[in-house]
Amino acid sequence: MNNLDAIYVDVDDFCLLFEPQWLEHLISTGEKQRIKPSRLSSSEVMTILIAFHQSGYRDFKTYYTKFVCQYWRHYFPDLVSYTRMLKLLQATLPALCSYLKQRFDKPTGIAFIDSTSLKVCHNMRIPRHQVFADEAKRGKGTMGWFYGFKLHLIMNDEGGLLAVKVTAGNVDDRKPVLDMVRNVTGSLYADKGYVSTSLKAELAEQGIDFITGQRSNMKRQPISSWDRAMLSKRFIIETVFDQLKNICLLYTSPSPRDPT
């Protein structure tokens, strides 16, 4: 599978540079971590996970036990049990986050920011949810109330990722903006949910022109035809959200169960 080979080569090249630096960081900060030897390398674990989001499988367990273990053993001869694989996925999280950051695109002078909800369970099951009980929060999006997290993205006009951040569901969309604009230049476009005079002023100090939609109860501000056209182009980020949720299976839509 050429695509799998390409993923592995790119990830493995990254891990060869990342792992010594990460180990040095842990030593310098005094963080104690018990690194248990594994038959699978970090690059193999990351490759399997990245390929999962391109596989079309609805859940990782079926993908790993019914597909990877049965059909990819010649690619990964030292496969571990599913339970052990889950532990390895947790251990490779720092490397995955760093790899994602390495894949960020370059700014083009035009950027868009938006957020989407990541539901962890149906609203009827909130009182019984335990997995993310300490992290997930109730929030409200365009589709109503939800329980979980928010995914915030900044993208350029070519669809390249510039910044990403995950927050609890009750965090205001405007709060993480200043932490996300380090790789942004020129104009940043957002919907009317991001309207904030103070935020616009702070971004202007960093050389970023922050342009948002206007709320119905606002005094109308003049806006150029170019900026109006760019605001209408924000659908590009909605397209990415749709791909992440429905093709890459960023999360599976929680379905209601019998509340009794």
Summary of predicted features, one role per range:
Residues 54-62:
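Short helix-capping/linker segments at secondary-structure and domain boundaries
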Residues 62-74:
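DNA-recognition alpha helix
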Residues 76-91:
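Major-groove recognition helix of helix-turn-helix-like DNA-binding domains
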Residues 217-220:
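Short gly/pro/ser/thr-enriched loop/turn and capping motifs at secondary-structure boundaries
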Residues 251-256, 260:
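Conserved small/polar residues in nucleotide/adenosyl-binding loops
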